[in-house]
Swiss-Prot record:
Molecular function in Gene Ontology: 4 iron, 4 sulfur cluster binding; aspartic acid methylthiotransferase activity; metal ion binding; protein methylthiotransferase activity
One record GO biological process: tRNA modification
Name of protein: Ribosomal protein uS12 methylthiotransferase RimO
Species, as recorded: Bradyrhizobium sp. (strain ORS 278)
Keyword set includes Cell inner membrane: no
Chief location bin: cytoplasm
The gene coding this protein: rimO
Keyword set includes Electron transport: no
Residues binding [4Fe-4S] cluster 2, per UniProt: C152, C156, C159
Length: 445
């Protein structure tokens, strides 16, 4: 039986964070609040006074991972607080683990704190109740996720995020910029801008202005990106929908204000499938825009995600997607095999695709993308690239170019004549490329 903390000592919290970067930011905010109240983080469940599990509920596989994490926490500790997307529909958790102390949905920070207080009241200690101005971060010190809004106004047929996280709620621009400035002052070299729909930022608050330094800044995608680009850090834009006004940020990339990188979840290319998904269907125009973007900014890297085996997807639809990829030349790609999600309207669509066909299409798409990636990376051999160092090994350092986001994209492996540090940005000569990664030598600091 775990003992927890000694009387009058700081209570200890064990934390499990699952799911996407948006959920990670939620975890960081909860931990920051708890540290400000004097709670300490425990390395193991059995050394904690209470365990918090921040769940993911987007796919059934993610729900199973969340349930397994709750089960482990119950077995090792017994005092468990559940929050996050799966907590928005608590029935499955209540049935599996009726003994959990509390279940709340995403962004319910006050409810989580109240549950922690009931399970293990805070003990004030002026030497412990100190939190850095940028808050507690769960990422390496040199990069951080910057969440600019919550929720989503889109109603894609395969997605239940609006049910779990609600409609779009944008933060005031000045609030975002103050957080970004604190992060950069604390040594963050790369800001990863995230939300459910980054390009819709400010729509819900009618692009309201807020005071920032000696001026007012509108809560608008372009305006926010421009101001973030003045802070001196790499700025990487994630979860951008291909709305026409996205064209406006390409100029900031050309000018070096934000990274030449767009993460756009196209999901498919066939008009028939996109219509069934309730996604923008003018992908012929999207190809023209991609060409225009790259014409203005040749270094632009595009990342995207796609779903194969969506209900009603025919062989012709899939062939259309492969042809579209050949023309679009997406640099970085993630692919998912469609799976039903409880509550999604796509579950009722006709033409469910057999699992073996989903697997065949996934294999074919990834093989095609591997060739595209290898071809695009080969063009970088002989060039000089700025690289941010993530890890330093005995002989080789691992970093990322401006075309690579952490954890989801490729890497650059470098040799150097002098020791390197994580977070350092160096100039490297690229000497070799494989399907997904680059290899080179540090040529400047």
């Amino acid at each position: 039986m775990q003992q927890g903390s000694a009387p009058n000592s700081a209570p200890k919290i064990s934390f499990v964070s699952l799911g996407c970067p948006k959920a990670l930011v939620d975890s960081e905010r909860i931990i920051t609040r708890l540290r400000a109240e004097g709670y300490e983080l425990a390395r193991k469940h059995d050394g904690a006074d209470v365990v918090i599990v921040n769940t993911c509920g987007f796919l059934d596989s993610a729900k199973q991972e969340s349930l397994a994490a709750i089960g482990s926490a119950m077995a090792e500790n017994g005092k468990v607080i559940v929050t996050g997307c799966m907590g928005a529909e608590p029935e499955q958790i209540e049935q599996a683990y009726p003994g959990v102390l509390s279940i709340t949905g995403p962004q319910q920070y006050e409810s989580v704190l109240d549950a922690v207080h009931r399970a293990s009241p805070p003990v004030h200690n002026p030497h412990l109740d100190l939190v850095p101005p940028q808050g507690i971060k769960l990422t390496p010190r040199h990069y951080a996720y910057l969440k600019i809004s919550e929720g989503c106004n889109n109603r894609c047929s395969f997605c239940i995020i609006p049910k779990l996280r609600g409609d779009l709620v944008s933060r005031p621009a000045a609030d975002v910029l103050r957080e970004a400035e604190r992060l950069v002052a604390a040594g963050v070299k790369e800001l990863l801008v995230i939300s459910q729909d980054t390009s819709a930022y400010g729509l819900d608050i009618k692009y309201a202005e807020s005071p920032w330094k000696d001026r007012s800044v509108r809560a608008r995608f372009l305006d926010l990106a421009r101001e973030l680009g003045e802070l001196g850090a790499w700025v990487r834009l994630h979860y951008v929908y291909p709305y026409p006004h996205v064209d406006e940020v390409i100029g900031l990339m050309t000018d070096g204000k934000v990274l030449p990188y767009l993460d756009i979840p196209f999901q498919h290319a066939s008009p028939n499938v996109l219509k069934a998904m309730r996604r923008p269907a003018a992908q012929d125009k999207t190809l023209d825009r991609i060409k225009a973007w790259r014409g203005a900014c040749p270094d632009l890297a595009l990342r995207s995600t796609f779903i194969v085996g969506f209900p009603g997807e025919t062989d012709e639809d899939f062939a259309y997607l492969l042809d579209w990829l050949d023309e679009a030349e997406i640099d970085r790609l993630g692919c998912f095999k469609y799976e039903p999600v409880a509550g999604a309207t796509s579950n009722a669509l006709p033409g469910q695709v057999p699992d073996e066909v989903k697997q065949e299409r996934w294999n074919a798409l990834m093989a095609r993308q591997q060739k595209i990636s290898a071809r695009r990376l080969k063009r970088k051999v002989g060039t000089r690239q700025q690289i941010i160092i993530d890890e330093v090994g005995p002989t080789v350092a691992k970093g990322r170019s401006k075309a690579d986001a952490p954890e989801i994209d490729g890497a650059v492996y470098l040799s150097s004549r002098r020791p390197l540090r994580a977070g350092e940005i160096v100039t490297a000569k690229i000497e070799r490329a494989d399907e997904y990664d680059l290899h080179g030598t540090v040529a400047g600091f």
